[in-house]
Design a protein with these regions (language model features):
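Unchanged
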Residues: 72-157, 161, 166-168, 180-186
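Conserved Nudix-box catalytic region and its N-terminal flanking loop in Nudix hydrolases
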Residues: 46-88
Length: 186
């Protein structure tokens, strides 16, 4: 960032008074430009004993499988964002139910919120960001072709909870440790 979005003046990267980290600061108008984590919202779309996955048509992780999810937009709730992302990526309409998982990914400044959801019908197809969209039972899931560790972790917990009759909110941190991604419970 080079210029202030409020007044157009050049900005400086420094620690503002009363803060503990460097921020982009405009000395002309006093605006402090904060850069905060992004919220990623998505669904675990269920149909009978199967869930809907999307094969990515974009980078990162082109060609790998994921749940329909993406960045939350201004002016929408997390549930609305999850439903919108499912419609965009899988052309699927869902009833968004309870929040299933919340994972912090501090190494990429993201927070994932994934909701259990019910497919309203079997009318789905790849959206612009998907190569393919399919329903999978647990035994059919291409575990070695999952796009992101957070999705693989969420699905592992989901199927374990479903088999055991559990369903409490799952939360944790997925952090990079020496090139490895590991999950730690909060």
């Amino acid at each position: 960032m080079k210029y202030c979005s409020q007044c157009g003046s050049e900005i400086e990267l420094r620690v503002p008074a009363g803060d503990d980290r460097a921020r982009h600061v405009c000395d002309v108008c006093g605006t402090v430009h904060y850069q905060n984590p992004k919220l990623v919202v998505g669904c675990i779309p269920e149909w009978e004993d199967k869930i809907l996955l999307c094969r990515r048509a974009i980078e990162p992780r082109y060609g790998l499988w994921t749940l329909p999810a993406g960045f939350m937009e201004n002016g929408e709730t997390s549930q609305q964002g999850a439903a919108r992302e499912t419609l965009e990526e899988a052309r699927a309409r869902v009833e968004v139910n309870e929040l299933y998982s919340l994972f912090n990914l501090p190494h990429i400044n993201q927070v994932y919120l994934l909701f259990r959801s019910r497919l309203l019908d079997l009318d789905f197809a790849p959206g612009e960001e998907s190569l393919d969209v399919r329903l999978f039972s647990e035994s059919e899931i291409p575990w070695s072709e999952m796009a992101f560790p957070v999705i693989k972790e969420t699905l592992s917990l989901y199927f374990r909870d479903r088999a055991n009759g559990g369903g409490a909110l799952r939360s944790g941190d997925i952090v990079r440790t020496g090139g490895d991604l590991r999950r730690y419970k909060i």
